[in-house]
């Protein structure tokens, strides 16, 4: 009886837990590869959405269309504020930092970015539209990318300009 009670409590705790990296990606790949039946898929999606919601994130998980990951990405800061379109494709060995958006072009939500292998996306980057980020590229902090990026490229912002104004006291 105690063992059953313990298993039930662990099950409930697992459902309401905030984010478990191993469990999240295990469920993600089972859904992505159609390895589970519909009722289990729905339960997995609910659990994944709860984990995402707690972290202010959305990794493109839907019942009929999900973003595609070749392999589990590296998330040094967890899910914190990461948004990925349902139609995005993410390559192998990709590193995604916090507050990154990989989204559609604002017109056609099926036109989402394709991220190559071994790409690093630093905090605050926004990658939008029907574009391709080539393999081994680096997207710098707070960069807004809306054009294709060739392989082996580094994308950075221009140096900030300082505009000095006289005070109007």
Language-model features: where?
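Left-handed beta-helix
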Residues: 59, 65, 70-71, 76-77, ...
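Short acidic, glycine/proline-rich loop/turn micro-motifs
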Residues: 106-108, 167
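Terminal amphipathic alpha-helical/low-complexity segments used for targeting or macromolecular assembly
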Residues: 1-61, 167-169
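Aromatic- and Gly/Pro-rich donor/ligand-binding loops
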Residues: 80
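Short, basic/aromatic-enriched C-terminal tail that caps enzymatic domains
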Residues: 155-169
């Amino acid at each position: 009886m105690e063992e059953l009670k313990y298993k039930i409590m662990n099950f409930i705790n697992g459902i309401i837990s905030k984010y478990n990296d191993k469990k999240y990606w295990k469920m993600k790949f089972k859904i992505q590869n159609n390895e589970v039946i519909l009722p289990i898929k729905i339960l997995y999606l609910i659990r994944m959405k709860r984990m995402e919601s707690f972290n202010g994130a959305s990794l493109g998980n839907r019942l009929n269309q999900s973003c595609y990951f070749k392999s589990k990405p590296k998330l040094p800061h967890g899910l914190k504020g990461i948004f990925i379109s349902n139609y995005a494709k993410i390559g192998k060995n990709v590193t995604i930092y916090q507050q990154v958006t990989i989204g559609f072009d604002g017109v056609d939500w099926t036109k989402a970015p394709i991220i190559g292998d071994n790409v690093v996306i630093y905090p605050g980057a926004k990658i939008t539209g029907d574009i391709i980020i080539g393999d081994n590229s680096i997207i710098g902090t707070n960069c807004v990318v809306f054009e294709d990026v060739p392989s082996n490229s580094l994308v950075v912002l221009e140096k900030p300009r300082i505009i000095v104004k006289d005070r109007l006291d």
